[in-house]
A protein has these predicted regions:
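Long, well-ordered alpha-helical scaffolding segments within enzyme catalytic domains
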Residues: 35-55, 103-114
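Short histidine-centered catalytic/ligand-binding loop motif
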Residues: 20-42, 94-101
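Divalent metal-coordination and catalytic microenvironments
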Residues: 7, 23, 41, 79-80
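C-terminal helix-cap and adjacent tail motif
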Residues: 84-117
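Acidic pyrophosphate-coordinating catalytic loop
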Residues: 68-75
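A short glycine-rich, hydrophobically flanked beta-strand micro-motif that places a catalytic Asp/Glu
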Residues: 57-68
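Single conserved hydrophobic/aromatic residue that forms the stacking wall/gate
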Residues: 1-6, 11
Length: 117
């Protein structure tokens, strides 16, 4: 892979055109990322996804960002994967949602709201 840091593309091989957004300043994960860098990363992700979709003629697009080992994080420097998708590409980014009761959903919502206030 040809990796450059900052707003340059880091080309990977998961899918034709798979790239990374990799900030120059270190943050191990999203929790350590400054609000300013988080905003810049998302704005760049939108611009790159739009340009890559037009350039590569892909059928869809995934933007993936993992935090913590159990979530699949293996590189402990914040980064976002930009993954162009093509019909029949067999790239495996799927999960099977569980089911929660309305009471469980409400409890989760209340706990998160408490942390936000």
């Amino acid at each position: 892979s040809a990796c450059l840091v900052g707003s340059e593309m880091c080309i990977r091989d998961r899918s034709k055109g798979h790239a990374l957004i990799l900030p120059k300043s270190h943050a191990a994960n999203i929790y350590e990322l400054s609000d300013e860098m988080a905003a810049k990363a998302m704005i760049l992700a939108k611009k790159m996804a739009t340009a890559m979709t037009a350039a590569l003629k892909c059928d869809g697009f995934n933007i993936v960002q993992n935090n913590g080992e159990c979530a699949g994080q293996t590189v402990f420097h914040f980064h976002m994967h930009l993954i162009p998708r093509y019909k029949g590409d067999q790239v495996g980014i799927t999960w099977h949602p569980g089911e929660l009761s309305d009471a469980d959903k409400e409890e989760i919502l209340l706990k998160v709201k408490e942390q936000l206030s």
